[in-house]
Design a protein with these regions (language model features):
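Short coil/loop residues immediately preceding or within conserved phosphate-binding loops
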Residues: 42, 199
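Conserved beta-strand edge residues that scaffold enzyme active sites
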Residues: 38-39, 195-196
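Glyoxalase I/VOC metalloenzyme domain signal
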Residues: 1-34, 46-134, 138-190, 194, ...
Length: 225
């Protein structure tokens, strides 16, 4: 996989805009980037997170009461910490600030609960071409995907629900990477499409149905999409 950015992004959905913004900016201390309109009463509030982006997607209308995704937490590396600091956002999503380098976390680590660790190992190493750094730990750039818990994870027909719902990997060629992942055994979560002249994106799904956005941003790759 040819990366356009060496950091994974993480997306969540919430109906609690003001409370979430206060938490991520004041409690966690993430710098605010900007707000983008996604349509359908959805606004994306982007925050810098060690080169990654925390995407707090605020929904104007009530979100469907879906089962939680398999994304159960995020660890954020921070200089100057003596130990880990567990936190929870206003919807109960787990966040832990960790000393930089703790268990190999240099940027962020996205924590998963999985039904089948072997299926996830095949997916992350073969379909997604991430590097296995140790058992249940996979590196993409300076970000980690970590198998932290074992099942159960319930698939949902709809993916826009409360809590952590997807990760994003920024690539040079969305179509080529999407087709390559499917050819290597990944499953589609949404065919490539354009968002104006700024982004081409698609979705694939991990073995438990968690969505991964394959994003090609003109601001990172240059030129036309």
């Amino acid at each position: 996989m040819k990366l356009a950015k060496q950091h994974l992004d993480l997306g969540l959905f919430s109906n609690k805009r003001d409370e979430q913004l206060a938490f991520w900016q004041r409690t966690v201390g993430l710098p605010y980037d900007h707000m983008g309109k996604l349509g359908g009463g959805m606004q994306q509030h982007r925050h810098h997170m060690n080169g990654s982006i925390l995407k707090m997607n605020h929904a104007r209308d009530p979100l469907p009461a879906l089962a939680p995704s398999g994304i159960v937490g995020v660890q954020i590396a921070r200089d100057g910490l003596a130990g880990s600091q567990p936190l929870a956002d206003p919807d109960g999503n787990k966040v832990t600030l960790v000393p930089k380098g703790h268990e190999g976390v240099e940027g962020i680590a996205i924590l998963l609960r999985v039904n089948d660790a072997a299926a996830h190992d095949r997916f992350w190493t073969h379909a997604m071409q991430y590097e296995r750094v140790s058992e249940g730990r996979y590196r993409c750039g300076d970000s980690l995907i970590v198998i932290a818990e074992h099942g159960p994870v319930e698939r949902s027909a709809e993916w826009r629900g409360p809590g952590y719902r997807y990760t994003t990997v920024q690539v040079w060629d969305c179509i080529a990477e999407y087709e390559g992942i499917l050819a290597r055994g990944g499953s589609s979560g949404g065919a490539p499409r354009l968002l104006g002249d700024a982004v081409r994106f698609a979705f694939v799904c991990d073995p438990d149905g968690n969505h991964i956005e394959i994003s090609q941003r003109a601001s990172l790759t240059g030129g036309a999409l």
